[in-house]
Every structure is written in C-alpha cells, then in structure tokens.
Amino acid sequence: MMILAGLAFLLATFQTVADPGDPVFGQGDRIAIVGNTFAERMQLDGQFESLLHAAHPGHRLSIRNFGWSGDEVSLQPRPLNFIGMKEWLSNHETDVIIACFGMNESYSGDDGLDGFSRDLDAWITTQRANTYNGSTPPRIILVSPIAHEDLGEPLPDGVEHNFILQRYVDAMRRAAVSHDLVFIDLFTPTREAMDRGEGPLTINGIHPNASGYRLAACSMAEQLDLLGRLGNDSLDGDAVQDQESQAAVRRAVLAKNQLFFQRWRPVNTEYVYGRRHEPYGSQNFPDEMKKLDELVSEADQVIWSLPPGDVTCEIQEEDY
C-alpha cells in the first residue's frame, strides 16, 4: 500500500513535462512501441496499454510491441534475414511511435552523449520521412529511461549512473523540443519515488517490476493528459466493478501480446527467415504466419469488445 500511497502523491504533485496539446491518440490509431528492454517488457505487464484503452473507449486502438532487449537508437541487431523495422512499421500501418531509448546508451557515459544526440536526431528525421500508414508521417512520443534504483549489494547503487542518466534524459528532452515531439520523462518521477523509499520498483536496479511498471504507466498517462478520462479513485460501488473491467482488459491485452510476440519473434527464426528457410520454412511457415496475423487481429477485437471501466491508474496489486 505504501507504493500506491506514494503513487497518489506523485500524480498529485508531479509537473508534466510533455505538452501534447491536441489529443495524442485518435480514432483507429495504430500504435507501435519500439526500443529497449523497458519497451519489450511492457508487453508482459500490459498496464500502460490497458490505460490507453480505458482512456479511449470506442477508439479501437491497435497496439503492437516491437521492443527488443538491448536495442539502441542506432544499434538494433537482428537474426539473419529478419524483417527490418521499416517493413514491420509499414505492415502495421503505424500512426504513432512510442520510442523508449537512452538506458543502454547511457552506459557509454559522457563520452557517448554527443553521439547519442546525433543518432537520436537522425532516427527522428528518418522516421518522419516515412509514411507507414500510407498518408502521413508518424507522430512520435519519446520516453526517457527510468532512474537507477539502489537495491543494495551485490548490485551497483546507481548513484553515479543517475548523474549520467540525467544528461541523457536532458538530451532526449532537447531532441523532443527541437522536433516538436511529445516527451515523457520517467526519470524524474521514478527517482523521486525511489528517494522517498518506495519500492522495490525494479528487479535489478534498472528494469521495472510490476510496481515499477504501474508507476511508469500512470506517469506516462499523466504526462499524456489521459488521467482526466479515467474517473475517480474510490474503492466502493461502481469503482470496484470498473477495476474488475479494467483487469479483464488487461488480461485480453496480455493474451494479444503473447500472440503477436509469436508472430513477430517466432522461436526458430532459422527456419522462418534464416539459412533453413529453404526447403522447409518456405513450405510451412507462410500459412502459419498468416494464421497468427488473423489471431492477433481477433485478439484486438476482443479488447475492443470489453467495457474499459472508469478506473484509476492503480490497475493491479500482484507482481509477476
């Protein structure tokens, strides 16, 4: 309960950094989450996606997670012949990109900061030169790294790393201002929560647990100006039913994410894309991939059919 109490304090006091102005997400938007381990593990948590659906009932948002642990803004290794990100974003007809970078890059320290800024600028320029949805450049939301939590020995305490992380977060903020993008600062609210002794919020100092993802999801929603759509925070009457409805949405989101992960990152890419694609993969896998596409689309329909509930951002207590 201490985490939830601190979360309420955070949402009451934290000054939003992003100024999205007009609503960021529109009817039927197709959203892509890209980036590092933080982005990839969002698919196992589902809280931010659930909040997006709750804040946009009837919008039929279609969200795909393309996060890949270890990805950097300029370094994204893939298996042999793996489909490039541009093709994936085009296949999804992406309207909005939520990009989570900066944590991996921060380990290059001050020496890597200028290069990161240049690479991020180039990445933004490249994305905006594309029309993945067939008509307009994608709207881009930059999401900063969280702070480094001190979990005690044998893990690093993160004191020096946080000084460096702050510089990388500032570089991302400058890039967002330069390109007129929405910027979400997760470093400040997570560091403030850690300084207040809430937690643990991570499993190893830098990768969130369920409580950390709850804090991140609520902070992202707050900075995107979505919380006004999410109702009251009471735990009686309709609010209980609303939380149950939101839990059902989250379960449907997690089921969809699992199906899409099997489509986007099949277990044996050597047969799907690689050196054993011929003669075996070319015979078996195209039909399997088509079927998975159909199942993922059906999973979207399930999410859209559920009442989102008028909920608080405190979605779940349990860890995973």
PLM-predicted stretches and their roles:
Residues L44, F48, N81, M85, ...:
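Stable alpha-helical elements in mature extracytoplasmic
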Residues G26, Q43, P200-Y320:
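Conserved catalytic region of serine esterases and O-acyltransferases that act on ester linkages
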Residues L4, A8-S69, G84-E93, I97, ...:
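Serine-esterase "nucleophile elbow" of acetyl-processing enzymes
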